[in-house]
Regions:
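Subset of outer-membrane beta-barrel
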Residues: 25-415
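Gram-negative bacterial Sec-dependent N-terminal signal peptides
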Residues: 1-23
Length: 415
């Protein structure tokens, strides 16, 4: 089961990639921007603008050609409480406890000094310890991957995009009565005769959401009092898959979270839009709004438990100072990023830098923080390679508090 949990988010990312979709800790994955603290509203390139800010699509230079991103993928996992190992351990302890009960006879069970009775006592104590250690513990992950084709034009630039973002969270409800019953068996093994393991009430929860977008972006640049202002919009079809995995903690298997038994899906329409303006040769400011139409989608009801996933507008402002050698950028969310109603909201700010010492090499770093303090703050870094300025390979990694780590990669080509 440990293997299932450790690769749960990675499996989601792979499935998204196979479906030609994309996504991230934001509502997008783009390796260059992710390496720069998740920024990009003002600093993104025209070829990746459709993933970040559709207005950037209109900022192509005269000699820029068609750009194809195939693919962009990334994943992030946070497990500050080491929950994956604790859940694996409790699975082993449950099996051990049940095994000791199955293999003991009545005479040995009633004799507290027998070896078999002591085994029951020890197994009950181990299980109670594990339950106690699970109280209030959570683990979460985010992932994405996808494609985009951007076609610049002096009149109207166009891009085609398929992107998605995925998030998953594992948590538990530990019933104190379960611990008390197991402590009783630990003290008096014969008490197991009147305690049915199947009647224990503690539960494990797995919530997961995958939101995929399929859209066509259009963008155009205007001259307003000598200031180049770009405007972009992305109408998109939006599909959502929600998973509500609710089971007894003693039967919890994180590999089952994405089973169709716990899945609900929904299809709707949404819009992204953005602005970008250049001030002089070195300054760009941007504003983007993702998912401008709010949507609340209920999960399937499982074991009497239902949750609601919230898709709501996320408005982000950004600024960038750039030269041929150096780019400095900062982004800040003006609205909260919502998810399941059972979870806390986040609101991100990020700063980043890129140094381009050679025409084919870029080195990047950044920092991203949640001002609501509900998600991990992370340091980011990455490199970009562009041999012959035709094939672009971007790699990024992140590490932060609460045992948070992640990685991403992107391959793009220009023609």
């Amino acid at each position: 089961m440990k293997k299932h949990f450790k690769f749960l988010v990675v499996s989601i990312a792979v499935s998204l990639f196979m479906a030609n979709q994309a996504g991230a800790a934001n509502t997008w994955t783009e390796a260059r921007s992710d390496a720069m603290g998740g920024t990009g509203v003002a600093a993104g390139s025209y070829g990746s603008g459709v993933l970040i800010n559709p207005a950037l699509l209109a900022k192509a230079k005269p000699d820029d050609g068609i750009t194809v991103i195939l693919p962009s993928i990334g994943a992030q996992i946070s497990d500050k409480d080491n929950l994956r190992d604790k859940i694996d351990d409790i699975s082993d302890d449950v099996s051990n406890y049940r095994s000791t009960l199955d293999n003991i006879n009545l005479i040995d069970l009633l004799n507290p000094s027998s070896a078999a009775s002591r085994q029951v006592s020890a197994a009950a104590g181990d299980l109670a310890d594990q339950l106690d250690s699970l109280k209030g513990k959570t683990a979460s992950g985010k992932a994405g991957g996808g494609i985009a084709v951007s076609i610049p034009n002096d009149v109207l630039s166009v891009a085609f995009v398929a992107k998605a973002n995925a998030r998953a969270r594992v948590s538990s409800y530990i019933d104190q009565g379960d611990i008390e019953k197991l402590r009783l068996v630990e003290d008096v093994p014969a008490a197991a005769l009147r305690i049915n393991p199947n009647d224990l009430k503690s539960k494990g929860f797995g919530r997961a959401a995958i939101v995929s977008d399929y859209g066509v972006a259009v963008a155009r640049q205007f001259d307003i009092s000598g200031v180049p202002v770009s405007v972009g919009i992305t109408p998109k079809l939006q599909q959502t898959w929600l998973y509500n995995y609710t089971v007894s903690i003693y039967n919890f298997d994180s590999g089952d979270i994405n089973s169709s038994r716990y899945r609900n899906d929904d299809t709707g329409f949404n819009v992204d839009a953005g602005l970008a303006a250049d001030f002089g040769e070195n300054w760009t400011v941007g504003l983007t709004g993702k998912n401008l139409f709010s949507r609340d989608i209920d999960t399937k009801e499982v074991d009497g438990v239902r949750d609601t996933y919230q898709i709501s507008p996320v408005v982000t402002a950004g600024a960038a100072w750039h030269t041929d050698l150096l780019t400095l950028t900062a982004d800040g969310d003006l609205t909260e990023t919502k998810g399941f109603k059972s979870e806390e909201n986040s609101q991100y700010v990020g700063v980043g830098a890129e140094v381009t010492p050679l025409s084919w090499l870029a080195v990047r770093a950044g920092y991203r923080a949640d001002v609501k303090d509900n998600d991990s703050n992370v340091f980011t870094a990455g490199v970009g390679f562009a041999p012959l300025n035709t094939v672009h390979i971007d790699l990024m990694g992140l590490y932060g508090e609460d045992e948070t780590w992640g990685a991403g990669a992107q391959l793009s080509m220009t023609f």
